[in-house]
Amino acid sequence: MQNPFAASPLSPDAVFAGAAERFFELLKTFGLQAASGAGGAPEWSSVAGALAQQFEQWLGASPALGASLAASAGFSPAGAPWAFGQVPLGMAAASGGEGENPWELLVRLAQLQGQLAGHWSEIAKSSAEKFVTRLRAGGAPVGELTSEGALKLYELWVECAEEAYARTVRTEEFCHLQAQLANTSTALLLAQRRQADALARAWGLPTREEADALQRQIRELRDELAAKPAAKGAAKSGAKPAAQPAAKSAAAPAAEPPARPARAARAGERSSPKRRAAKSAKRARRGRRPRA
Amino acid sequence: MSATGGEAAGIFLDLGARVAETLARLREARGVTVGGSARRAVWRHGKTTLYRYLPLEQAERGAERPLLICFALVNRPYILDLEPEFSLVRRLLEAGLTVYLIDWGDADDGDRLRDLNDYIESELGGCVRHILDAHGIEALDLMGVCQGGVFTLCYTALHPQQVANLVTLTAPVDFQTPEDLLSKWLRGIDTELLARAGNVPGEMLNAIFLSLMPFRLMQQKYVRLLTGRSDRRAVETFVRMERWIFDSPPQAAVAFTEFIRWLYQENRLVRGTLSLGGRHVDLGRIRQPILNLYAAGDHIVPPAASAAMGRYVGSSDYTACAIETGHIGMYVSRKGRAEIPGRIISWLRERQGRRGPAR
């Protein structure tokens, strides 16, 4: 048994409490309206504005693809937790360097976020209108506002909201905006990293570019090694004990296999060099593809 | 409808009491565990671990061929063994199957350049070859889940001799069906730029998945918890699910962006233009029996995206089945629990005695 949550920052009770709080806000709005209509039919149209406002605020703080990426680059006013990593130098670092001008990117990002807010507003308004229309068409619970009645109102509200949301976020315009938001915020993140790299270089520290170059080199070396027939033969016969354990214990399989797992697999649970050599020969006779 | 001030206050008091009770249960459930079925690690490479589940004492007669489960990179595989009651793995073990599972682990900065070919050929391939050698067999049964389903399709197309039967669960094949909102959102992403930004954090994936249906997934389900069955066991199951939903691992930059570009943006799998390691992935080469299970109400992999498989594979023994549930409901809903394990087990049993595909 494992508890993968021990180190997780997520607290289900906190998420639940947040949702419950918003639910109560909605109920308050429903309840006030119902109370105002006591003795007569409530006028739900007056509640639409309040609902739309609450909803728009929530949408603005919720993640969508573009907004997520913007937040991940550290440019969300809410400071969402899904960051690629902390931008080390803050906004002041977003200046100079090659590529697109970071300040231009910032301005573009702000413009895009403004457009996104326009969509949230449209969705919120449309949801509220749908909600009121359906209530008038007979969707409102009849009789006293009970817990069950309130929940029915809530379910109807969610249905209307989800429909309005789906209609907007499927439009070409919205999809294009999402992509632009994501691309712009990623470009801005990279611009900041370039700046951070410049500072690291000045201080004689390894840069991201250098780390990437090293990784590429290691990868190329691995590929070259794997492509060499001699290396393959040596690995098949188990002739690389330094890199490859002759036999791994199934109970304690911590030993790292060599670069190519195909060969590591050959040194499986019950293999011996002799046995593996016999297997290799058998495979060769059957014309089986070498395992790469 | 009317409500007096006293009645409205009563509603709030009632709901307030329910919130307090549910919160207390949620707090109690914070220590819940997952993955109840005993297993041992039998092979490792990089971050990838291959687990073999230990057979159950009360299991039925064992099957000849082992079953390897390949899960998606974007989520953790413990959803398949969330708790004894909701455990596909356990049902398979009870039926006497020998079950292996791939856990991809967490990509870190050293995995930025890891690509799809690495995951499919080296990691999935390494697991397959290990099992074949360990059992002294020519072919195994393969099960791919969601993105893992795509991997298993690719692997089977490239190595048909190593796979006897293929089972896929919620596996997308056509990435550009009209209902696919995720696909619409991803089409304009600059993947080269994204790849340069490094590994993609799991939290970002969570946010994207949740934003497909934000009100249902971020609001309504919690409110339903308030109003539904909220005994200790139900709350514990809820917490396990929550943890899984918010527990996406980071994604290796290159593999992630390749997946977006090649599949979501270019739809290479169905266009027949996908290559891995210089080898063409031709779904028409898959002549193995295939069982394709997908969710009729799936908001992540729309049913049409998965049902398209039948048009592209070369198998003459292809069975597709839509389950009346959602994406996650495939693993944890009562409907999924009632239908899926039984279908997989009986389908595999019918084919256990048969030889693997012709080479």
What is each of the regions a protein language model found here?
Chain B
Residues 1-35, 357-359:
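N-terminal targeting or regulatory segments adjacent to alpha/beta-hydrolase or S9 domains
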Residues 320, 324-339:
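Catalytic histidine-centered segment of alpha/beta-hydrolase-like enzymes
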Residues 140-145, 295:
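Conserved alpha/beta-hydrolase "nucleophile elbow" surrounding the catalytic nucleophile
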Residues 1-5, 11, 133, 137, ...:
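Alpha/beta-hydrolase-fold enzymes
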